[in-house]
């Protein structure tokens, strides 16, 4: 054998040894599968190859070293950890590259928004997978994702054909972890989990232009130590859509130690924290609006809301809302309302359903809020003949801006309307307005005004109170 052949043989053996070593210790570097990370070359095919290699070996950690990885759809599989090292960015490809997977076929899209219907046309997606995780101190930048919802108009890609509409989309998965990552510009939803069981979202930072985190028809999920800035939509929202073609409860959910805000897009991440000044600022923690099954056994604790709307709990699609516990919430510069609880009969679902939306056993304790909008105080409204039952408000102090005028026009019944107080106009009371409630308990509830308000502090209509 010549020296040249010996050198070639040695190099080949060395390369094979390195590759096998990577596989044997369960770590799969995407650079070894062709990823470039220059922000110009499409890298999702190489990343998917690394994932498939790990799957063939029974699973493992797929690592993205520092670099910018221009990507279309990445398909997450069972027993895979997608790990973004510091300095690694997954950059969503623009529509013109047509890099996203085709949307799946779905037979009943009329009962929920398109964002809840289609998953495969996302930047990172998984369906019917288990033991999956996305970790690391890297970033997902959804620059090429759309924030539009146009699927119901016949465009199944969510925007221009070929455009992804979600940063992370998980459906019918089990044992899910998303930890430490940052998401900037997450598309229609930065994270959506639908029909998933046993999940953890921890220490995640999101600065996006639509919903931050959507937990839909899921059970046994925890969202903790997470910061979400969403000036134009909901920050952390639980839903119960018809995306699984049947009513499914969202239940056994804990949201704790989180911060939600409504600053201008990008200013949370860059640290300038510029308040959004448009009329509609959201950034709230919400249950709804999709509520076919409803919500049960939900705890929200130790959270902060800043420059955003407050808490909204809505069941209007024939589901039920019960056993909701809220404790230790701090709010500052609150848009529209601090707390909103309502039932209604929008009934967005199959017409043959006969259930009536219901809510009961809602306990809200230890809430402090300052600089709240004068539009509305706390709102608790059921439906005539179908009251909300057993609502407890205790240890609550809210400071309102005041300046409201007397309200002579009857406040509208929720009925079939979309549940949004700003469309209903000012409430009859600046502090608390309740209607159709059976069992309202108030303990140590205090309202303050920054300037005089012509409305009374509390107005109750068709309400039975409990001492």
Region roles according to the model:
Residues 2-12:
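Bacterial N-terminal signal peptides that target proteins for export
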Residues 23-467:
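Extracellular/periplasmic carbohydrate-active domains that bind, remodel
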């Amino acid at each position: 054998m010549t020296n040249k052949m010996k050198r070639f043989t040695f190099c080949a053996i060395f390369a094979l040894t390195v590759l096998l070593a990577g596989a044997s210790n369960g770590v799969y570097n995407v650079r070894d599968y062709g990823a470039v990370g220059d922000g110009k070359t499409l890298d999702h095919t190489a990343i998917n190859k690394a994932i498939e290699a790990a799957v063939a070996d029974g699973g493992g950690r797929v690592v993205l070293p520092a670099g910018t990885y221009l990507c279309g759809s990445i398909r997450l599989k069972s027993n895979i950890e997608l790990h973004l090292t510091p300095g690694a960015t997954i950059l969503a490809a623009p529509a013109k590259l047509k890099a996203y997977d085709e949307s799946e076929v779905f037979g009943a899209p009329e009962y929920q928004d398109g964002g809840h219907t289609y998953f495969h046309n996302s930047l990172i997606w998984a369906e019917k997978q288990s033991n999956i995780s996305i970790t690391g101190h890297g970033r997902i930048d959804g620059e090429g994702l759309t924030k539009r919802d146009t699927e119901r108009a016949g465009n199944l890609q969510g925007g221009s054909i070929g455009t992804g509409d979600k940063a992370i989309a998980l459906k019918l998965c089990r044992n899910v972890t998303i930890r430490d990552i940052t998401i900037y510009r997450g598309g229609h939803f930065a994270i959506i989990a639908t029909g998933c069981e046993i999940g953890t979202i921890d220490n995640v930072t999101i600065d996006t232009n639509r919903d931050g985190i959507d937990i839909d028809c899921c059970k046994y999920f925890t969202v903790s130590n997470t910061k979400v800035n969403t000036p134009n939509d909901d920050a952390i929202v639980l839903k119960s859509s018809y995306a699984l073609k049947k009513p499914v409860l969202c239940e056994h959910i804990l949201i704790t130690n989180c911060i939600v805000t409504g600053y201008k897009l990008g200013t949370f991440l860059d640290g300038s924290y510029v308040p959004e000044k448009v009329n509609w600022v959201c950034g709230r923690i919400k249950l709804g609006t999709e509520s076919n099954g409803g919500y049960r056994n939900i705890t929200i604790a130790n959270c902060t809301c800043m420059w955003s709307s407050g808490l909204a709990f809505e069941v209007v699609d024939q589901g039920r809302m019960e056993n909701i516990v809220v404790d230790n919430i701090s709010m500052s510069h609150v848009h529209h309302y601090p707390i909103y609880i309502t039932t209604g009969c929008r009934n967005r679902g199959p017409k043959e359903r006969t259930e009536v939306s219901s809510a009961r056993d809602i306990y809200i304790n230890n809430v402090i809020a300052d600089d709240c909008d004068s539009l509305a105080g706390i709102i608790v409204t059921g439906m005539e003949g179908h009251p909300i039952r057993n609502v407890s408000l205790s240890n609550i102090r809210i400071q309102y801006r005041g300046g409201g005028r007397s309200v002579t026009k009857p406040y509208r019944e929720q009925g079939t309307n979309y549940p949004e107080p700003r469309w209903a106009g000012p409430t009859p009371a600046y502090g608390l307005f309740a209607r159709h409630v059976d069992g309202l308990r108030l303990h140590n509830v205090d309202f303050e005004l920054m300037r005089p308000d012509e409305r009374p502090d509390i107005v109750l209509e068709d309400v039975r109170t409990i001492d």
